[in-house]
């Protein structure tokens, strides 16, 4: 992997305090396992948006997977389908959303950035729905790009052949502007920086897909999400890449769970590296977690096989953590196993 591509995937914003805190906060939560609970059988499945997931983790939306491997999102989707892992495809993928839909990982959701030009937004939503995507994930923490100093020191250069495929479809609005020859600045400058909750209502009104909002870190915002028709809330700080010193996602999770008050599903991304991290997030009320960087680094090292191995590691670690904690069902993990 080229150094600028590695830095793009690895880095956070400013001093990377939030990036580190996402991991450190998981480490501060210790476990209080139960004994003699018959650990011979465990059910790792969960239900999210009314759909059963074989495993309680999904692939987080990350841009430009071909920077890690020539097969990019195709390899990730094939591995996910093989292991029963869900995928949230990024707007900024290097493979068209229609091609990923043909592989049919399940569930398959589409992550959306809302553009100033609503024709682009409508086009993306319509294409995702027509292709069979099961949900729309709207990222709301990026009205502007965070100050990512690794990318300043090592400017991201995207090869000409690695276009932002979803914005480069010949019949898409303004497709000719989507070639990221000089990095992502041109694409990101088109994001709508004036979004409000009313825009979330509008998005919900133009699709039959359930809409989740990604980037919430507060219970009051989670409550507003429910009031404006969101079916899910993803606790996220963009992997520590936007506002530095923002709260860690696992720290924010209980407040968000309380805010939705059982009226929407809550998921979490940011800092998930081990099976015990998945266990802790579920014990605090998340229905599932999203995993980003570990999947893309596995892709860089081993392609589709590397991603398969990453899925297997996380599944096996989570299964072992459940067994050692005396927990039988992933969808019924008691909070009292946590020392908080």
Annotate each language-model stretch with its function.
Residues 12, 90, 111, 138, ...:
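Active-site-adjacent beta-strand anchor residues
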Residues 53-97:
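Glycine-rich active-site/cofactor-binding loop and its immediate structural neighborhood
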Residues 64, 77-78, 99, 103, ...:
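Alpha/beta enzyme core
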Residues 81-103, 107-121:
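A gly/proline- and charged-residue-enriched helix-loop-helix capping module
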Residues 1-50, 148, 155-195, 331-333, ...:
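An N-cap/entry alpha-helix motif that binds or orients negatively charged groups
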Residues 9, 87-89, 109-112, 212-213, ...:
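Short catalytic-loop micro-motif centered on adjacent basic/acidic residues
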Residues 30, 45-47, 56-60, 86-90, ...:
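Short, conserved beta-strand segments within well-ordered enzyme catalytic domains
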Residues 1-27, 248-340:
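Alpha/beta catalytic cores of nucleotide-metabolism and tRNA/nucleoside-modifying enzymes
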């Amino acid at each position: 992997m080229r150094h600028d591509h590695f830095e793009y995937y690895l880095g956070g914003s400013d001093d990377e305090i939030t990036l580190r805190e996402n991991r450190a906060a998981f480490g501060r939560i210790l476990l209080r396992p139960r004994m003699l609970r018959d650990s011979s059988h465990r059910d790792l499945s969960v239900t999210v948006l009314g759909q059963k997931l074989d495993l309680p983790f999904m692939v987080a939306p990350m841009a430009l997977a071909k920077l890690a491997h020539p097969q990019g999102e195709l390899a990730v989707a094939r591995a996910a389908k093989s292991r029963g892992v869900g995928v949230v495809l990024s707007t900024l993928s290097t493979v068209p959303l229609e091609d990923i839909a043909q592989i049919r990982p399940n569930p398959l959701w589409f992550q959306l950035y809302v553009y100033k030009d609503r024709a682009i937004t409508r086009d993306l939503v319509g294409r995702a729905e027509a292709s069979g995507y099961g949900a729309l994930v709207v990222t709301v923490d990026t009205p502007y790009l965070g100050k990512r100093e690794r990318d300043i020191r090592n400017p991201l250069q995207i090869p000409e052949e690695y276009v932002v495929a979803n914005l480069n479809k010949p019949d898409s609005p303004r497709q000719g502007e989507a070639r990221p020859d000089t990095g992502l600045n041109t694409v990101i400058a088109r994001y709508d920086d004036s979004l409000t909750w009313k825009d979330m209502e509008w998005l919900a009104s133009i699709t039959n897909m359930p809409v989740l909002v990604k980037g919430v870190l507060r219970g009051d915002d989670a409550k507003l999400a429910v009031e404006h028709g969101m079916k899910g809330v993803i606790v996220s700080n963009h992997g520590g890449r936007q506002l530095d010193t923002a709260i860690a996602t696992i720290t924010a999770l209980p407040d968000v769970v309380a805010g939705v008050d059982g009226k929407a599903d809550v998921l979490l991304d940011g800092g998930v590296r081990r099976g015990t991290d998945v266990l802790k997030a579920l014990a605090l009320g998340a229905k599932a977690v999203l995993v980003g960087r570990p999947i893309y680094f596995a892709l860089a090292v081993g392609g589709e096989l590397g991603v398969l191995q990453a899925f297997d590691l996380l599944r096996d670690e989570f299964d072992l953590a459940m067994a050692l904690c005396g927990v039988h069902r992933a969808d019924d993990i008691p909070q009292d196993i946590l020392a908080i």
